[in-house]
């Protein structure tokens, strides 16, 4: 069985039309707000647990905004160095044959589109402050060089880090200088009615990618287990569980024993191993 073509990005699989028809009242309310906020020019802060779909929501905001024809520039903030963010956000003098230009890499790439600061809360506070200052200063300086560059910011914060920065000077700076709209994403365990919908979507996506999985489905027992699990890794973890089940079931029916052992109440010997005496 060929499975190499099953290694796809989680963002290719979630929060498209399937999520716009979410059964969860929480998500329906969020999508209603997002569709209205998309048309505004406000900066946005998305707060949610890891794997809850913040990046895809940012893309949906972009796709439904007046900036949809502009770029969507994502900047992943985890494990970056000081040089990484300075190269992206600080102004650099570029020496041409006939002139000297001030260039801001990510600001000019985003132009009048959107910059998505992915997991911004994982940065040291000094880096956060520098990036915000560079964004505001860069837009002003580029305007002086007759370059009208004003990308909109969407910032994602992990739930735990969000609570840590509340009340800090960097949080006050974000509120004062960006005047953002705050959107809180619910974890998957608070919207369990969407789990069967997402599983069905993931299975259909897997079927599209390989004929080896054209008969793929999930058993009622496996679906029950998925629907009653807390999913600490949220949508990303659910996707990975279904992907594992698809491979271990050889593209047939995903049973409980094909799901990750970490989410099962079964003991090891119940998976076919003999109980030790």
Where are the model-predicted features located?
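Short acidic-aromatic loop segments in the C-terminal HATPase_c
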Residues: 121, 136, 179
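ATP-binding "lid"/motif region of the histidine kinase catalytic
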Residues: 21, 75, 138
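Hydrophobic helix-rich structural segments at or within alpha/beta enzyme and signaling domains
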Residues: 114, 120, 133, 153-154
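Short, intrinsically disordered, charge-balanced linker/junction segments flanking boundaries
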Residues: 271-277
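Short gly/ser/thr-rich secondary-structure transition/capping motifs
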Residues: 95-101, 135-141, 164
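Conserved Walker B catalytic segment
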Residues: 128-136
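Conserved post-Walker A coupling segment in P-loop NTPases
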Residues: 33-97, 108-122, 187-192, 241
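Nucleotide-binding/hydrolysis machinery
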Residues: 2-17, 23-28, 32-39, 49, ...
